């Protein structure tokens, strides 16, 4: 699949490639990098913002954003951990993102959990503490209110987001092929 | 631009589908990823023809698996704490009340339901709860639908007293069949369904005629069919109550936002207020995971069996793992000498086609184009078709155009397939390709020697008991050389994918979509049926036989400008 998908090129030197094959744009804004874990072969495109600095204010090491393999964070995406007042004080909670997750341009994500193979379209707002289960599809321009739970293999859209459809049994294979394909086509010119 | 695959919907004739000029044929074509494959029948199945059963129920909000025994009692809705906002249908959150106590913020009872989408709160309808869990059971006490539920249960109980016998009297023909003659209806239903239907006790009705009915419709006693014995049902008060006592006059005087939109009310379980301020939240509907079976009456094998706990499938027989994937791309327009605007006589078209078959297009003759650009009349387009092999052994493909039926409507294009026979290499693990990437001569093609292990096969896509389709074919190196000599124009091979050319000539008077079907026949080596069906041997034994499978794809290459 993807036999005719074109190469996606970037100017040489504008992306940093890590030992594990992550490709991170020099123009991405990554704060608190020590609190961010990338699984490998994931792409963070230019203008994306990852707020690893918004950590829980207690002693010790805290993972703020963890991301699996073959993820693609498009241009202008903002990922920040959700926070709320708990027992009288404001606390941030970590964001967990699975393998093969694609987030479209300019989407803002404050989810608590994004399962494997989830596809979020462009210009979405994913509210605080949203849980998106495996292999869900969030259509472009969807707004998911705070604490929405998206069950696996479903399609959501609209504002506020509603469950619109479910996906075929082959969706996992399709998503994995797509994400791995995109990674291999994303190269320096 | 689309490539759709044909499902014969259990038609066993293995005839090609009607061409796209028959609109009815469109219902047999769907994308490859939504099709199933039954190994027992060796056939493609689709969502329209598979037999579907519910495997499990779950709540889409709390994701709790609801035992199927409870589903009916719970009326297909989550019976925990999941409610949808009456205004925007977002799942409601449980919010505690916060208050200051000794300079400390304390949160606790009473709890209310709030919507994070539109800020609706259950306080507006007076719903508050003592506990943060089991909202549904707490609500059962004050649920205003209760009266209607009781009424329904009562009328059901009333009717159920007649549902004892499934052995109604034989039908007697009569010109006057009372519409309320339920045993008669039961019998008709049983006849139509070829099985017993638990019906109303006809025996009780024998020879008895309800006095009221008889006196009202007179003369009925003479009819052969008679009323069932059905005592009067006395309605409770439910129909009188309810808060929807507003008249149409009152409604018409109100502003629009005050009146609840129909879209917010039609999913309600019970007749409820037409005032938007008093529409009540409903429990969230349960979702299902489905088991799918082969629809063939003598087969009924499982094609899909979900796992209640995960997104994996215990059984997943999908066409994606059996049929080569066909994709179309890289469109080029052939630069022809003559202008395409003047209509050509049929002989002329024939002539040009023959010419084209003889002379091969030289490089520089063609110009790349965007795939979604409108097609021009009289132009010739050369596409690439990509075939990706999902099997662990090479396959040989024969690509043809099916013959249209005699009186088929005229077509707006001609299709020419320069390379009708070609091979597609086996699917391998990714690392195995890396070494061959540069190499056009994939060792896999030479390879009768390469036999995949059992594990390698069964782990793919979680498929169980997938039969090996071991193929050695005519793909020895000599066979390959032979093919080279014959000259496969424009054939590109990479890993388990082969790209071939496809020429489409848009006729001068063409309009609308250019759509056509292709017949794909592929040959693979299949195991001879193993004595133990559960465990097909993967060894390429002398019992292996060459098998062919034919399917049809429908290509839409765009619209004529
Ligand atoms: Zn079908
Ligand atoms: Zn079958
Ligand atoms: Zn629930
Ligand atoms: Zn709402």
Give the location of each predicted region.
Chain A
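Extended, small-residue-rich solenoid/repeat segments and analogous flexible loops
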Residues: 1-35, 39-41, 49
């Amino acid at each position: 699949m993807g036999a005719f998908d074109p190469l996606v090129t970037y100017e040489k030197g504008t992306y940093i490639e890590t030992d594990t094959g992550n490709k991170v744009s020099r123009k991405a804004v990554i704060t608190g990098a020590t609190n961010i874990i990338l699984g490998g072969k994931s792409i963070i495109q230019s203008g994306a913002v990852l707020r690893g600095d918004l950590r829980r204010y207690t002693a010790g090491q805290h993972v703020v954003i963890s991301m699996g393999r073959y993820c693609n964070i498009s241009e202008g995406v903002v990922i920040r951990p959700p926070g709320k007042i708990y027992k009288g004080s404001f606390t941030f909670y970590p964001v967990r993102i699975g393998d093969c997750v694609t987030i479209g341009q300019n989407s803002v994500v404050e989810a608590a959990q994004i399962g494997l193979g989830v596809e979020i379209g462009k210009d979405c707002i994913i509210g605080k503490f949203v849980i998106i289960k495996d292999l869900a599809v969030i259509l472009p321009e969807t707004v998911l209110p705070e604490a929405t739970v998206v069950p696996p293999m479903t399609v959501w859209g609209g504002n506020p987001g509603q469950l619109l459809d479910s996906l075929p049994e082959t969706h996992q294979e399709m998503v994995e092929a797509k994400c791995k394909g995109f990674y291999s086509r994303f190269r320096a010119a | 631009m689309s490539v759709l695959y044909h499902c014969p919907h259990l038609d066993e004739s293995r005839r090609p589908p009607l061409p796209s000029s028959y609109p009815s044929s469109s219902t047999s074509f769907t994308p490859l990823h939504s099709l199933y494959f039954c190994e027992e029948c060796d056939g493609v199945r689709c969502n329209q023809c598979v037999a579907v059963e519910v495997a499990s129920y779950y709540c889409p909000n709390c994701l709790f698996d609801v035992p199927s025994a409870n589903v009916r009692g719970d009326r297909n809705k989550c019976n925990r704490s999941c409610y949808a906002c009456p205004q925007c249908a977002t799942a409601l959150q449980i919010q505690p009340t916060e208050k200051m106590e000794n300079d400390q913020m304390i949160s606790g009872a009473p709890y209310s339901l709030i919507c994070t989408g539109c800020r609706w709160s259950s306080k507006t309808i007076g719903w508050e709860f003592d506990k943060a869990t089991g909202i549904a059971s707490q609500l059962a006490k004050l649920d205003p639908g209760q009266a209607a539920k009781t009424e329904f249960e009562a009328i059901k109980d009333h009717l159920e007293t007649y549902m004892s016998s499934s052995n109604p009297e034989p039908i007697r023909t009569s010109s006057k069949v009372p519409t309320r003659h339920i045993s008669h209806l039961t019998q008709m239903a049983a006849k139509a369904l070829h099985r017993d239907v638990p019906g109303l006790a006809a025996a009780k009705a024998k020879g008895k005629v309800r006095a009221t009915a008889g006196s009202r419709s007179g003369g009925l006693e003479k009819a052969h069919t008679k009323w069932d014995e059905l005592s009067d049902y006395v309605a409770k008060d439910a129909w009188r109550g309810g808060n929807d006592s507003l008249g149409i006059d009152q409604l018409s005087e109100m502003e629009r936002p005050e009146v609840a939109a129909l879209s917010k009310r039609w999913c309600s379980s019970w007749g409820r207020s037409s005032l938007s301020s008093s529409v009540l939240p409903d429990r969230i509907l349960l979702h299902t995971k489905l088991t799918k079976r082969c629809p063939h009456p003598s087969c009924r094998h499982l094609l899909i069996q979900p796992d209640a706990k995960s997104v994996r499938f215990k059984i997943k027989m999908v066409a994606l793992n059996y049929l080569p994937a066909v994709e179309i791309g890289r469109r080029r327009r052939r630069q022809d000498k003559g202008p395409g605007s003047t209509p050509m006589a049929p002989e002329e078209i024939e002539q040009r086609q023959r010419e084209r078959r003889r002379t091969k297009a030289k490089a520089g003759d063609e110009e790349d184009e965007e795939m979604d650009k409108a097609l021009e009349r009289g132009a010739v387009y050369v596409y690439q078709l990509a075939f990706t092999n999902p099997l662990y052994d090479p396959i040989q493909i024969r690509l043809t155009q099916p013959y249209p039926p005699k009186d088929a409507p005229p077509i707006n294009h001609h299709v020419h397939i320069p390379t009708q026979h070609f091979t597609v290499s086996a699917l391998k693990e990714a690392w195995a390709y890396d070494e061959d990437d540069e190499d056009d001569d994939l060792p896999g093609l030479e390879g009768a020697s390469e036999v995949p292990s059992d594990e390698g096969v069964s782990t793919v896509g979680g498929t169980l008991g997938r039969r090996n389709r071991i193929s050695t074919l005519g793909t020895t190196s000599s066979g390959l050389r032979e093919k080279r000599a014959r000259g496969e124009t424009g054939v590109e091979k990479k890993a388990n994918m082969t790209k071939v050319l496809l020429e489409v000539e848009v006729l001068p008077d063409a309009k609308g979509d250019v759509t056509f079907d292709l017949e794909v026949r592929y040959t693979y080596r299949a195991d001879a049926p193993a004595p133990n069906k559960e465990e097909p041997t993967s060894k390429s034994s002398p019992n292996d036989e060459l098998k062919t499978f034919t399917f049809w794809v429908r290509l839409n290459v765009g619209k004529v400008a």
